[in-house]
């Protein structure tokens, strides 16, 4: 098992995500200014303490908490969330697995890039 990411690595990745996603829920597009929001792990933290889980490509800002808003939707509608790229399996690579955002399908990289995905997406 890989070691846990240090606090500095976690904060750096979260800073990248906040800069990339701004004040907008990446699922519904709602403004997150003065609204509850959270940073969602596409590949769940419960899958081990790997430092890979704190990569910016694995993290995305959503409205709500794990039980409310879009974050709650992802946690309660796991099959649909998986089809749309919001939840990943243990072997899925967050950098190459697209997700359906409010403005189309995108891939995310670890440097803060958000790239339109032109490949085949699930129906």
What are these model-derived regions, one by one?
Residues 86-123:
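Short flanking/linker segments adjacent to small metal-binding domains or redox-active Cys/His motifs
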């Amino acid at each position: 098992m890989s070691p846990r990411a240090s606090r500095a690595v976690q904060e750096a990745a979260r800073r990248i995500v906040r800069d990339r996603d701004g004040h907008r829920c990446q699922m519904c597009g709602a403004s997150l200014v003065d609204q509850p929001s959270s940073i969602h792990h596409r590949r769940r933290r419960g899958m081990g303490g790997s430092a890979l889980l704190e990569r910016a490509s694995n993290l995305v800002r959503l409205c709500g908490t794990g039980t409310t808003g879009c974050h709650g939707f992802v946690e309660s509608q796991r099959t649909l969330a998986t089809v749309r790229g919001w939840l990943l399996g243990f072997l899925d690579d967050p950098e190459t697995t697209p997700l359906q955002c409010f403005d189309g399908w995108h891939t995310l990289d670890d440097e803060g890039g958000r790239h339109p995905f032109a490949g085949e997406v699930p129906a």
